[in-house]
């Protein structure tokens, strides 16, 4: 081959490679490389979280990790970031350490959390425990994250909180107990959204609702020792699912109007196939309230089993008349024993 021909072949080959790379950049995504990062100390865990990238699996050795632990990187649907460990791997925050990544223009702090996800999507949190913190696990502006098989206990306030428009997340196969040890009225087991009084901090825009929508809570054991509601569904949230959970109301304090397993103030939740037991201190099993006009409506209760020792109802819907055509529904498949007022205060359907 003549030198001029060799040059033509080389130029053509380079051009072909360049076109291939350009095509990959335009229409393809490179697969993330899975890294397994083993950690055994608080310093190692902080470093792994700071360097996290899609596909990482951060594995906790047994032991106690004390400090402010938070994730700010996002995984992807194909390559989530995983934080995993045995129940004997315990995250705590005894010195009220802070995630410094706070949003500008809002008067909020992120201090004292056992674990915090902060604008970090597509995570998996599995297996480990959280104890001795102000709050257990908090998700702020997080989507498509799964919390699976974790254990939260012994915290000052709420156990697990989906907040600041955290959507499409799942809490499953986990346990939450002994919450509200510092502030019983704020010791919810699972907290979805924010009260209207906190929308300026955690809502969408100026005083807009906290749209922590379409979150699922399934197959968990919540209680005993949960001082406030076992699940608090806040006004402004929509279309969540609460299914297949076991509730033990022993320890509900009555502080800050906490007198039921679930307090539903959002819209269009499916609340089904849950089993609850409660002592005489629990007024009702489930309550529906309207804190904001048009909310506390369209919630459907089906297949729930309630065992109570109280003067109230299994399912008490307090503001049905304010819901217009988007009525709450209590199906005939719900059952109750021990509630002196019966199954529900509204008509049972089906």
Predicted feature locations:
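Acidic, glycine- and Ser/Thr-rich low-complexity intrinsically disordered tracts
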Residues: 56-59, 99-102, 188, 193-200, ...
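Extracellular beta-strand/beta-solenoid scaffold signature
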Residues: 70, 98-116, 132-138, 154-163, ...
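Short acidic active-site motifs
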Residues: 44-48
């Amino acid at each position: 081959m003549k030198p001029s021909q060799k040059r033509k072949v080389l130029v053509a080959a380079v051009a072909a490679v360049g076109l291939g790379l350009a095509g990959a950049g335009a229409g393809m995504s490179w697969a993330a490389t899975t890294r397994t990062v083993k950690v055994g100390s608080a310093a190692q865990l902080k470093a792994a979280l700071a360097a996290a990238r899609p596909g990482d699996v951060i594995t906790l050795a047994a032991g106690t990790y004390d400090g402010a632990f938070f994730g700010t990187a996002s995984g992807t649907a194909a390559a989530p970031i995983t934080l995993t460990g045995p129940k004997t791997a315990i995250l705590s925050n005894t010195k009220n350490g802070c995630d410094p990544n706070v949003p500008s223009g809002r008067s909020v702090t992120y201090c004292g959390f056992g674990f915090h996800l902060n604008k970090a999507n597509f995570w998996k949190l599995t297996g480990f425990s959280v104890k001795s913190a102000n709050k257990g696990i908090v998700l702020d502006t997080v989507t498509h994250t799964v919390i699976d098989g974790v254990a939260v206990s012994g915290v000052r306030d709420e156990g697990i909180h989906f907040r600041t428009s955290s959507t499409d997340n799942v809490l499953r196969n986990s346990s939450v107990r002994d919450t509200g040890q510092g502030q019983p009225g704020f010791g919810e087991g699972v907290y979805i959204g924010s009260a209207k009084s906190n929308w300026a901090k955690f809502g969408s825009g100026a005083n807009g609702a906290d749209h922590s929508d379409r979150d699922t809570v399934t197959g968990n054991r919540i209680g005993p020792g949960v001082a406030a509601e076992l699940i608090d569904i806040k006004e402004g949230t929509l279309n969540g699912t609460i299914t297949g959970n076991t509730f033990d109301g022993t320890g509900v304090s009555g502080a800050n109007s906490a007198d039921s397993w679930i307090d539903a103030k959002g819209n269009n939740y499916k609340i089904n196939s849950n089993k609850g037991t409660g002592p005489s201190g629990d007024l009702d099993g489930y309550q529906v309230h309207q804190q904001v006009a048009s909310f506390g409506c369209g919630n459907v209760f089906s297949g729930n089993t309630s065992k109570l020792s109280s003067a109230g109802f299994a399912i008490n819907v307090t503001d049905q008349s304010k819901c217009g055509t988007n009525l709450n529904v209590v199906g005939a498949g719900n059952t109750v024993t021990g509630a002196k007022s019966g199954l529900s205060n509204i008509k049972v359907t089906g």
